[in-house]
Amino acid sequence: MSVKEHTKKIMKVFDKNMYYVEMGQGNTILFLHGNPTSSYLWRNIMPYMKEKGRCIAPDLIGMGDSDKLENKSAGTYTFIEHRKWLDELLNLLDIGNRVILVVHDWGSALGFDWAKRNQDRVAGIAYMEGIVRPLKNWDEWPSSSAPIFQGFRSEAGEKLVMEKNIFVEKVLPGSVLRGLTEEEMEVYRRPFNIPEDRRPTLDWPNQIPIEGHPKDVTEITKSYSEY
């Protein structure tokens, strides 16, 4: 299992640089990461798939090596904001039709939503730990992690994430059965070494559609869950 990073390409999207890994040719196989990861998540999978198609794995805006947004306040990196930047990147990359999506975590929500809006362009979807529908209440969330995710929606959560970087330092390695090496952890830490750059990792859990909030994400996830 390799810990080596693949060389990334750069695309100017609106006024920012977004980074992505690309290898292979043919119909697009689109890899979308979640929180708090990056295209690095797919480093050991894409080499096996590059003979099957054009593999593309972007770093979402504000994550991985992609540029950060100027606004550092809460609620900057919403689902809708991520969708805007991802849509434009995919348009610029001309990903074509017969797209296969390989998606994880919030990448699944972005991927499902894109698929719902581009149904005639989708050849297949493979998803892991996906956000497949809105949740009625916290009882539907895994009990082992519900308290901390509820805590992210408080002042204490702001401190835990923005000051202590808990999503990278604790939540991420705690969700990987084999554990992560120090070299792997350094790759995931790098985009969030500066406290103010950690905003995406806190905004994402606050976008989880529970009890009807946020309203727009609840409506979007409900719509694609019926797709």
Predicted features, each with a name:
Residues 35-46:
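The serine-hydrolase catalytic nucleophile loop
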Residues 44-53, 92:
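A short, Lys/Arg-enriched amphipathic alpha-helix followed by its capping loop at the start of a domain
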Residues 33-36, 192:
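Conserved residues at beta->alpha junctions
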Residues 27-33:
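Short beta-strand element of the alpha/beta-hydrolase
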Residues 47, 58-61:
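N-terminal cap/lid subdomain of alpha/beta-hydrolase-fold enzymes
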